Amino acid sequence: MTRLSIAPASADDARIGGFLDRQKRRVDAMPPGMCPLAQQLTLLEEGALQTCGKCVPCRDGLPQLAGMLRHLVDCQADAAEVERMRALAEMVRDTSDCAIGYESANALLEGLDAFAAEVESHVSKHECQRSVGQSVPCETFCPAHVNVPAYIALVAQGDYAGAVQMIRKDNPFPTACGLVCEHPCEQRCRRTLIDAPLNIRGIKEFACEHARADQVPVPKRLPATGRRVAVVGGGPSGLTCAYFAALMGHDVDVFEERKQLGGMIRYGIPAYRFPRERLDEDIRGILAVGGITVHTESPVDAARMAQLSADYDAVYVAIGAQTGKGLRIDGTDAEGVFSAVDLLGRIGDGDYPDFTGKKVAVIGGGNVAMDCCRTAVRAGAEEVSVVYRRRISDMTALPAEIESAIAEGVEMITLQAPAAIEKDEQGRCCALLTNPQMIGPVKRGRPAPVAADKPQMRIPADVILIAVGQNIVSAPFEEFGMAAEWGEFKADEQLHAQMDAEALAARGADASAGANVFVGGDCQTGPASAIKAIAAGKVAARNIDHMLGFNHTLDCGVEVPPAQPNDRAAYGRVEVLERPARERKNDFDAVEVPMSTEEAMQECGRCLRCDHFGAGACEGGRIQYA
């Protein structure tokens, strides 16, 4: 019998492992603006490289497909070759023996359909579409398109006030985004090619820590235009629109239903994540522009909306998604069952709950659920659990929020779907009954749960918080004539509100009524992030300005520092730390500890200044962009 031995890892295997790690980092840092067909080609060539060669369709078909796609990327293919490529891809997909062949071919077919306009441009115009061109990844992926390299360079120079002014050129909530932004700007940071993406949010937080938003001078307001703009909703989107419209010289009135400004970043985010005094700094900075009049505790119904549309030159509706969705299960009317959105809203006005000695169950897996469970811990709950019908990896909450909740003692009960709420004799909730789930087929990009053949679970609970989504209060605005669908107002790309002809006729309004109404933020997109709401407010202000016959240009008055040589040595990423869990879970004080000056300077030094190096380069049929 032949003896067995443990084969040592070869040097080639180690080198290949290192190469694959580099390849993964390159994919992670794929810049925006690349030709999608070129990306398809990269994927297809990788599939051809991986083929084992045992089946002809995969072994011979994939290299042929790669050659045909290369012709198309180089703008040398005609329509007939595209059709031959499609037919060959269908054959490879249908006859390959393994996933390498049929998945590679299927991905190509999906790409040809998804990027049909790009294919047509390569064939008929012999160039990529105008939307293709290397851009600065962080600035492109920021919904508000903040000039990230510029303010990082200003922080590196120690000009913290200049950095805040640079941020405010596109985003008047620098402090909010320094503390609670989901930082999509970091997704494709080119620094990933070397080590890890920059901690952009942490640098912004550091800048706002050293130059408070209400102490940094605001830009000078442009000459008055005599035009009036009404903003319905004093949240991040509404206040952003008000800020930019006022800077352009328009007079703005903000109508807010609640006692205080801030919207869902005041009434939906707990103080331990975003201290209220820091939010007030941003708001004071916005109002310092002048020309903005605030009306709090001023709800807007259909009649008042009609009056605003008649009295003002433009109206921007940004009411947010301020109500919680319910669950269609028995027992939701029990005492002790609360909407997570309502609970956080009361906390926003300083009405903190007392859960001392109670068992709290939170239903949901998003950021609101994490905010609720961590709030319950601070409110003195004896036990806190999050009940979710999928896995932890499927939760939509930020991974850092999940990790922090677990560190503070929250139990994650996964693959359990709420079935009913059990009441005691006094009508109070005493337990949550759940049906076990197992992970099933992938639907809409993630695995869907299906019922598992296991007994029902009983989770004791004195308080149950429902955090399964948010809705808008659309009825008054629909009565006015604004069109809504699936709980969201409808608008075009310029955020002009779409009007419902039948609703307008029902109230005897002219068909042109509402032509000056814009809508944006969560009430138009569905619940999203603060930075997306801010971006909508910026877009609305710009388009309102155009509608009123102007084309104002705003300047923050700060020069972008020149790019400095960078040795590009690999460094670890500086993370923003939190206070120890055993300490922070006992109060509502800020949990994050901002970077030190040394940490911030090191992190700023990692910036590759993509605004100066590597932007605009092109090849093949790609158009040169400056």
What is each model feature region?
Residues 1-129:
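Redox cofactor-anchoring modules in respiratory/redox and cofactor-processing assemblies
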Residues 227-253, 369-377:
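N-terminal Rossmann-like FAD-binding beta1-loop-alpha1 element of flavoenzymes
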